Regions:
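Conserved active-site alpha-helix within GNAT-family acetyltransferase domains
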Residues: 179, 191-193, 202-219
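Conserved GNAT acetyl-CoA-binding A-motif
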Residues: 159-161, 188-201
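Helix-loop element at the rim of GNAT/NAT acetyltransferase active sites that forms part
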Residues: 41-68
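Conserved acyl-donor/pantetheine-binding loop and adjacent beta-alpha core of acyl/acetyltransferases
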Residues: 101-169, 173, 223-227, 245-247
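C-terminal "cap" of GNAT-fold acetyltransferases
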Residues: 198-203, 222-255
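A short helix-loop-beta-strand connector motif used in the catalytic cores of GNAT acetyltransferases and
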Residues: 66-93, 100, 158, 162
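A short beta-loop-alpha structural element at the N-terminal edge
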Residues: 27-41, 49-52
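Conserved acetyl-CoA-binding loop-helix of GNAT-fold acetyltransferases
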Residues: 168, 174-187
Length: 255
């Protein structure tokens, strides 16, 4: 059935009218569990070419699945990850269509337990991932991330801010979204006098983080694929200088 817009002529003179809240394009907002589908899909797009994501799904030849099947699994992994972090942590976004998303675990919280694994759906990956991907995810990546964080942070491992994911869609990069998401939580971390810990999955992003005060403490090398995948463990100590940082948005990263 054709539908006529009777107010078309009245509105055509004002092309700026929109039902999308204008603040979404410039302000960081906290997400909810009900945002799981949209935020998870946004993260999937942000990390579609991420070295760690490709490694976990065996795109290097470990899995002979079709690209469509791998994409659907990638989306599920990101939705499960979102639920795992949002259960006890904080999820933030900026942009009119979840253009950039960050997942955080504040001090005193964790998603590294069986309750979060079961509730979020992460446990389903044991059955959904290809055989080699399952080994990489559960036997290699999970343990080494946990152990390395404990080694670096020591008795502060549960008393720091942990940036699990921060990703910007390819279509929204260069707008400073990642900077705003980081600044939003850095301000809180400095107020709390707490360090921030992350794992960078691409060397090109290390300079981006360095502008915020992050320093590389250790490299993790994943070796189950045909070429090694490197993760860079970085820490930012609390700083008293509250002057704002303005740097370019260099893309996405897994922390």
């Amino acid at each position: 059935m054709a539908q006529v817009n009777h107010v078309e002529n009245h509105l055509e003179s004002d092309i700026h009218l929109s039902l999308i809240p204008s603040s979404w394009g410039s302000q960081v907002r906290e997400l909810h569990m009900s945002d799981c589908h949209d935020a998870g899909l946004a993260l999937a797009h942000s990390f579609a070419t991420d070295p760690l994501s490709l490694y976990l799904l065996g795109v290097d030849g470990a899995a002979s699945w079709s690209s469509e099947k791998l994409w659907k699994l990638h989306v599920r992994l990101m939705k499960y990850s979102y639920a795992s972090y949002k259960l006890r942590g904080v999820a933030t976004s900026i942009g009119p269509d979840y253009d950039a998303v960050a997942l955080w675990m504040p001090p005193g919280t964790t998603n590294d337990d069986w309750i979060a694994t079961l509730w979020s759906g992460i446990w389903r990956l044991w059955y959904l991932l290809p055989r080699e991907g399952r080994k990489r995810f559960f036997d290699e990546v999970f343990p080494i991330l946990h152990d390395t964080k404990a080694e670096i942070m020591g008795n502060r491992t549960d008393d720091c801010y942990y940036l699990g994911y921060i990703g910007t869609k390819a279509s929204a990069r260069g707008r400073g979204y990642a900077t705003k998401l980081l600044d939003h939580m850095i301000y809180k971390a400095d107020e709390d006098n707490r360090a921030i810990y992350l794992e960078s999955s691409h060397v090109r992003n290390n300079k981006f983080y360095a502008k915020f005060g992050f320093e590389i403490k250790k490299e993790i090398v994943l070796t189950r694929g045909p070429r090694p995948i490197r993760l860079y463990c970085m820490v930012r100590e609390p700083q008293n200088d509250k002057s704002s940082t303005s740097v370019a948005d260099l893309g996405t990263d897994k922390e």
